[in-house]
């Protein structure tokens, strides 16, 4: 903020003080409120009725049919000088329009601050609609952020014209001065809305209707559409200002030394080229200079502004500290003291994206033999070597030939093989850090003080070494993945598909030299020949279940890259991989007479049929029409055998769950959800697998038994974030089962079939809101022995408790023991999964009138989801997305907000309503103590596997997932904070105990739940 004083006139000496702010000091993200879209034409030309019947394809573009069809606005910030995109786009959420017009009234915030933009920056508003499940531009608008007339930031309401074609030529007509097109009446109305005129209620009631009528008569019709937006208003006008950096000047090095006269009387030392040499007297003819090969590197860094500056003393210390010839023999026998061991353990638990200090790197280097000799990737109790290899590889200097040769010729070959590498470390080696173009980046700076030919030769030799070593590490990681069985590999497949982006950056990119070196293997020419791509395609072709999910994961990423060309990275990698997979799958199935390729074609046909069905429903019915009519239409459509959905031409595996074969659907059990997107609930007809030993099939021929599989198909939402959360929950469930801890979780299945559509498994459930509001018969209400008889009314009459009592008779037998699909020993990874010992009998008490089996399911699942949702930072928790199944299993749904994001103010760290505790008997019941014990065991178990979970999130940083892209730099940090890795196990348990107490006793979440229930009631 600045204050400028000016004389008002020449005669009087009074001054006017003007206060304003500077844009360089405004560290606030750019925000825009999208208000509404105005149509200046009275009669919008729509497609006539005859054309609708002649050409059904016109229904794809709803703006040709409905005057107020669905649209959304996408905002980008561009640099006006070069028209370069300088921010990631943000878009409005779905909004149901009425007959009055298209109104959003949504506030959008971009990921760029005001102090980061130039005076020529402008906003581009892309108004889009969905055509064939893909965004299509309806019109574009432009607005400059600064006015060049006054060099001030624009604020308040603005009316901007809409161009009906996305032509880059329109960006040349951006108005940087006073905006053209606003009438005097519109300017005054905007000034009135911005608060420049006082508001008088009695006068406004009389004048505003007449102003609106006059406004309609004098409406500007230069354009068919105008977009109204609002920019934030600040207390002071914001004047553009930029920071001017001074170019530092460095005096020649020789001048500083020549000014120091030699002292003949002192036997002193001087430093020549960073080496301490005894100084002889000036009369001594034996004076000599010693050449230091590192001196020209540090000196050239001062002359090259693009080079990274290093302290020459630190560089020399590092070289002497890691002199291979001097300390290799001593380092082999080094063992850390207890204090150093604790320090090293603290370094090991740091997340992979955390940069280690020089002292920490030197410690890792010093005790490299100690960790390498005692490594055992399959020993979970050996914490000291956990994640050592990636930490060690991050601590070496990749530009130092000695350290590289020592690492890849002695340490890794003799001490680290595939069996000793953990799966989490293998995933880390496939990340973006191990890239030769970034590890060797400082090497390729221009150096004017050395010979070009010698420098190119040295750089080429060094790059080839780095490149081959990185390729070796990635091959080592892939070899470790080959030891995993297909079920375990499926747990990491989503991240491995993302890792293909990093493979493409290495294998598709040409080296920084013109000619290809013979020392670089030929697999550098194509992503398809990368070890990871080759391995995934090979396993996907051989295993139908793995291939099913591999196809859909790659297909969605391919469509996302094609629809978002601004995303960095090679755009054809997923297209090439997809085509290669289909080609090899077709050949493999033809050679071995397998139905995998035919099943894949049927799955694609099935998804296209569902997509066309949703589009037909949306085109046939208005949004506000009764859901019953849509349901009736859906059932008639499904029952029509001509549509081929009642009975499929051939059975095929369900894309959502390939272990289920589907052959048709049940129309009467299908429905349409009451939602603006009109998602479908389809109950599919499944073919159940026959059990061995049935003689009837041999005597009377084949007789299939049929089952039911309800699912939801949704268009309009990106399900990849929910898909990621469910995958992490499924992984955590397997990690817990690997420790013989089955918490009865319900990781229902989700599969994104495109960036805006997908399938969701429909699990029978009821929301806690409906359970708590129901009235149960007196026969269910229990007041027998135990704590409930004389406990508080909130416990004895708890709706959850009554719900469990009501369903206690339905499940009297225990569920079979669920085994983990994770390999406890790599030698058994491709064989049968080891059988876990039988779990002990549940310690759940049955004095509440509930079956011990249901209460066991309820308490365990509550504990599991309590810990998991806390670690993942799941937000927007209310009683409508906390669910309970008839088998007593408690679970969460709708993961639209994760990593600490929440639309409500002051969200709790953990969602644990008191009603959930009352459902297990209350705070003073023994079941509550059992619940807390399960929470503590779950939390400590997942903390031990934090490295694997963090590495999975590390591979997802470049995925187009909303809550990850919101702040990708802090994703790993947010998850790591929840693990509290800096605490001991006892401290972590105490921390979680405090979290439970705070959540149970919290008052604000109870109020918000009541308000949410009230809002849902009035909305219904």
From Swiss-Prot:
Induction: Expression is increased up to 12-fold during exponential growth, followed by a decline upon entry into stationary phase. Autophosphorylated. It is found in: Golgi apparatus, trans-Golgi network membrane; Endosome membrane. Its EC number is 2.7.1.137. The keyword ATP-binding applies. It catalyses: a 1,2-diacyl-sn-glycero-3-phospho-(1D-myo-inositol) + ATP = a 1,2-diacyl-sn-glycero-3-phospho-(1D-myo-inositol-3-phosphate) + ADP + H(+). It comes from the Eukaryota. Gene3D superfamilies: C2 domain, Phosphatidylinositol 3-/4-kinase, catalytic domain, Phosphatidylinositol 3-kinase Catalytic Subunit, Chain A, domain 4, Phosphatidylinositol 3-kinase, accessory domain (PIK). One of its GO terms (molecular function) is 1-phosphatidylinositol-3-kinase activity. The keyword Cell membrane does not apply. PROSITE patterns: C2_PI3K, PI3_4_KINASE_1, PI3_4_KINASE_2, PI3_4_KINASE_3, PIK_HELICAL. InterPro entries: ARM-type_fold (IPR016024), C2_domain_sf (IPR035892), Kinase-like_dom_sf (IPR011009), PI3/4_kinase_cat_dom (IPR000403), PI3/4_kinase_cat_sf (IPR036940), PI3/4_kinase_CS (IPR018936), PI3K-type_C2_dom (IPR002420), PI3K_accessory_dom (IPR001263). Residues 666-1004 form the PI3K/PI4K catalytic domain. Residues 49-210 form the C2 PI3K-type domain. GO terms for biological process: ascospore-type prospore membrane formation; autophagosome assembly; cellular response to potassium ion starvation; endocytosis; pexophagy; phosphatidylinositol-mediated signaling; positive regulation of transcription elongation by RNA polymerase II. It holds the Pfam family PI3Ka. Keywords: ATP-binding, Endosome, Golgi apparatus, Kinase, Membrane, Nucleotide-binding, Transferase. Residues 892-913 are annotated as: Activation loop. Residues 672-678 are annotated as: G-loop. Disruption phenotype: Leads to defective acidification of the vacuoles and a lack of growth at pH 8.0. Vacuoles are considerably enlarged and electron-transparent. Shows aberrant patch-like accumulation of vesicles, which are localized in the periplasm close to the plasma membrane. Shows a staining of punctuate structures, possibly multivesicular bodies (MVB), that are scattered all over the cell, the result of a late block in endocytic vesicle transport. Results in significantly lower carboxypeptidase Y activity. Causes disturbance of normal nuclear migration. Also leads to avirulence in mice. Coiled coil: none annotated. Belongs to the PI3/PI4-kinase family. Multifunctional phosphatidylinositol 3-kinase involved in acidification of vacuoles, pH-dependent cell growth, and autophagocytosis. Plays an important role in protein transport and virulence. Component of the autophagy-specific VPS34 PI3-kinase complex I essential to recruit the ATG8-phosphatidylinositol conjugate and the ATG12-ATG5 conjugate to the pre-autophagosomal structure. Also involved in endosome-to-Golgi retrograde transport as part of the VPS34 PI3-kinase complex II. This is Phosphatidylinositol 3-kinase VPS34.
